[in-house]
């Protein structure tokens, strides 16, 4: 009777439950977990081949040309947002845009909706679209291409599946940048950019930081995912321009193997939305 009553008391004793679970049941419960843990651990990524910066850039140029020659048409959506906080007053605006791309470098934009500051819409967003439409011209592309004619490259190291390269412009131009690029070690495509303009686009801006990321589309093409530019204003204030790229649909493309071409002196890859810093600077100057 005593032992039964004692067992009943133990059943309602939190410490008894704690001791019983910890000493008896947890080891048994943990056994199947422990035996399955090694299979669940993430496997280390294979080390990248030890390539020089020249070799990485050469592969990048070749693959960019293949992808550019293969990509014939796509559609997509973009969300533009600019937030300015500072002197003389804060302002913000957004715009939703649809884009149609046709090879080799033609883009057509349709504005779906817009909210906020009319000044930002006209002085920044509209001009960004106009600049990008004009960027398809061969002479304009040549000024901004990420290649040996415009940049000097050096290997900074590796990070996961990417080679990391330092990029230095050969001339001080507001259309060129200095910073780092991340190049996928398998596809040899730019996946990320962290940089700043080689030359300030305006007296009114003191510093701009550019953050670009890219996404793989249809397992073959690398297209922009997000573009964020943070600009500091000389008289106080910060402007943050964010462009998000969504809903890509590649509607026409050639097989990459059939798109191979000889490598020219410059790679077929330009910094996306290269006029963003200039248009933000124009907006700043209009508020003085």
Predicted feature locations:
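N-terminal secretory signal peptides that target proteins for export/translocation
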Residues: 1-23
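Intrinsically disordered, low-complexity segments enriched in Ser/Pro/Gly/Ala and basic residues
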Residues: 2, 34-35, 285
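Bacterial N-terminal signal peptides
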Residues: 25-36
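Sec/Tat signal peptide C-region and signal peptidase I cleavage site
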Residues: 38-42
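Structured extracytoplasmic
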Residues: 43-178, 185-191, 198-207, 218-221, ...
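Beta-strand-dense domains in secreted/periplasmic systems and polymorphic toxin scaffolds
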Residues: 193, 225-229
């Amino acid at each position: 009777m005593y032992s039964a009553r004692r067992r009943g008391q133990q059943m309602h004793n939190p410490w008894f439950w704690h001791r019983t679970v910890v000493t008896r049941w947890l080891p048994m419960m943990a056994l199947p977990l422990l035996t399955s843990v090694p299979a669940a651990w993430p496997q280390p990524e294979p080390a990248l081949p030890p390539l020089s910066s020249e070799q990485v850039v050469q592969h990048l140029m070749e693959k960019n040309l293949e992808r550019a020659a293969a990509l014939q048409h796509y559609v997509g959506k973009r969300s533009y947002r600019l937030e300015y906080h500072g002197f003389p007053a804060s302002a913000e605006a957004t715009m939703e845009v649809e884009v149609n791309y046709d090879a080799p470098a033609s883009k057509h934009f349709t504005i779906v909706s817009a909210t906020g500051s009319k000044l930002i819409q006209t002085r920044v967003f509209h001009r960004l679209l106009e600049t990008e439409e004009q960027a398809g011209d061969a002479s304009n592309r040549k000024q901004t291409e990420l290649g040996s004619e415009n940049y000097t490259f050096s290997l900074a190291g590796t990070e996961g599946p990417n080679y990391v390269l330092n990029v230095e412009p050969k001339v001080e131009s507001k259309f060129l940048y200095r910073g780092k690029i991340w190049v996928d070690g398998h596809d040899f495509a730019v996946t990320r950019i962290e940089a700043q303009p080689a030359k300030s686009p305006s007296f009114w801006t003191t510093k701009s930081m550019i953050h670009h990321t890219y996404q793989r589309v249809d397992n073959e093409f690398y297209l922009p995912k997000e573009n964020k530019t943070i600009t500091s204003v000389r008289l106080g204030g910060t402007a943050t321009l964010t462009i998000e790229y969504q809903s890509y649909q590649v509607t026409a493309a050639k097989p990459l193997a059939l798109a191979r071409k000889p490598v020219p002196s410059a790679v077929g890859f330009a910094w996306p939305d290269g006029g963003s810093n200039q248009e933000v600077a124009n907006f700043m100057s209009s508020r003085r």
